């Protein structure tokens, strides 16, 4: 893991609390985000003042970042790299405290405020169980085990780096288990299978998209206001799915940080792409490639790669072999992100061989 990473401020992150009629609807989205420039500006200012301008580290799709101790201590979980870095500008006692709270934090993203510097609550069902083992190879499930592990880390694995202003930063790095991605994926497999059955979407496609979108990070957020495991954007895909379900408005952040609801919404959107926006593509493999690309860039952008007229674009796709559709979308889509997205999801999907009624087959 890199010792420090620079991220652009995420323009939405966890918005100020809004008053909505219920947890499912967030029609006050505009009001909910009016004060975010001030909020994110202050957040950035706090970090700049304490850590320095080149040390801005914030949460993203595949990175959990939480500040504590008035921003003097922070925890960073890289879900891609499978590594946890906990560092402080304070003394070892702060590091010790943060190690324990990070190891024992819960999986409920709604209960963790990434915009404050308060402690993360200790959970009786820690998220990192199964993903991290201590120096004796044991699971870290309670305060006693976490405390012993923290003491071991401080005595044997403590490292120091220096900021540009010369201030020392003490830190420890905790590796996740080698198969950490598969462990996280398996946790959500029952929910994935439920959604796959409900909407008729291949389980391996859902897994491939989730791995590419968030690396199965339940705390995932992004600069594009995408939320949760399947990175659903509330006011676009979320609103479309609510309309499909006969609901008004759009899903709230709390709604989308619920894994079951997030997965259901993401998979429902895939069915909209398949049955509505990309309807007319006859070859199932060609349609799958188009669906994957459209999940990232939108169906309109995908069709315009072939022609500005929708019907002509569909006809062109239908005259091509799936391999040709794949090549065009991965080389000629105007968005580099979309080109790479199809490559990544297709590769990830191939790595999953999900067998019905079994949960032990993930790679």
Swiss-Prot record:
InterPro entries: Lysozyme-like_dom_sf, Murein_transglycosylaseC, Murein_transglycosylaseC_N, Transglyc_AS, Transglycosylase_SLT_dom_1. Keywords: Cell outer membrane, Cell wall biogenesis/degradation, Lipoprotein, Lyase, Membrane, Palmitate, Signal. One of its GO terms (molecular function) is hydrolase activity, acting on glycosyl bonds. Residues 1-15 form the signal peptide. It is found in: Cell outer membrane. SUPFAM superfamilies: Lysozyme-like. A lipid is attached at residue 16 (N-palmitoyl cysteine). GO terms for cellular component: cell outer membrane. Disulfide bonds: none annotated. It comes from the Bacteria. PROSITE patterns: PROKAR_LIPOPROTEIN (PS51257), TRANSGLYCOSYLASE (PS00922). A lipid is attached at residue 16 (S-diacylglycerol cysteine). It catalyses: Exolytic cleavage of the (1->4)-beta-glycosidic linkage between N-acetylmuramic acid (MurNAc) and N-acetylglucosamine (GlcNAc) residues in peptidoglycan, from either the reducing or the non-reducing ends of the peptidoglycan chains, with concomitant formation of a 1,6-anhydrobond in the MurNAc residue. Its EC number is 4.2.2.n1. Coiled coil: none annotated. GO terms for biological process: cell wall macromolecule catabolic process; cell wall organization; peptidoglycan metabolic process. It is a lipid-anchor. It is an enzyme of class 4 (lyase). Murein-degrading enzyme. May play a role in recycling of muropeptides during cell elongation and/or cell division. Belongs to the transglycosylase Slt family. This is Membrane-bound lytic murein transglycosylase C. The gene is mltC.
